[in-house]
Design a protein with these regions (language model features):
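N-terminal Sec-pathway targeting helices
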Residues: 1-7
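A short, solvent-exposed, low-complexity linear motif enriched for acidic/polar residues
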Residues: 7-157
Length: 157
């Protein structure tokens, strides 16, 4: 009986520790709806204020940039403060008139500062991060296009 109580108490302690040491982060993307832009993101990472990168996702997800936020990924991470988001963009497609064209993204990596003091993740709660992309499309000649968006991120809850 005493052993059972000790085991239950230990398990409760582990659950409480995990609950208050980790929080959930949801990353949303939003863009300029003046033309259709689809990006495929193969990796999403957050940089911790205390140093080091936390991987949120390594699976490919395609989202359309619209004026309403689209969920890109959700993950459980250690509570703390985060200052930068990094997204690996494996492909981008833009609709220009009736034609879909592939656009390159310089370096394939978007390094996005988290403005207004960064992202604060508290144990046992959910923090939402919104990535705002102002797509800047440049014709590089011969039917080739480059997408070099102006991007920021901010905590919305």
């Amino acid at each position: 009986m005493v052993i059972a109580i000790v085991i239950v108490a230990a398990l409760a302690g582990v659950v409480l520790y995990y609950h208050y040491s980790y929080g959930t982060v949801e990353v949303y993307v939003q863009g300029d709806p003046s033309f259709a832009v689809y990006i495929t993101v193969s990796s999403v990472m957050l940089h911790s204020e205390s140093g080091g990168w936390i991987t949120l996702s390594n699976s490919s997800t395609t989202v359309q940039l619209t004026n309403s936020p689209q969920l890109l990924t959700s993950s459980t991470i250690p509570a703390g403060n985060y200052t930068e988001l990094r997204m690996v963009v494996s492909s981008a497609e833009v609709t220009i008139g009736p034609v879909n064209v592939t656009a390159s993204v310089p370096s394939g990596i978007l390094k996005i500062p988290i403005i207004k003091g960064g992202l604060h993740v508290t144990g046992g709660s959910t923090a939402k991060l919104e990535v705002l992309m102002g797509p800047h499309l440049v014709s590089t000649g011969n039917g080739q296009y480059m997408l070099s968006p102006v991007v920021t991120a901010e905590q919305i809850s």
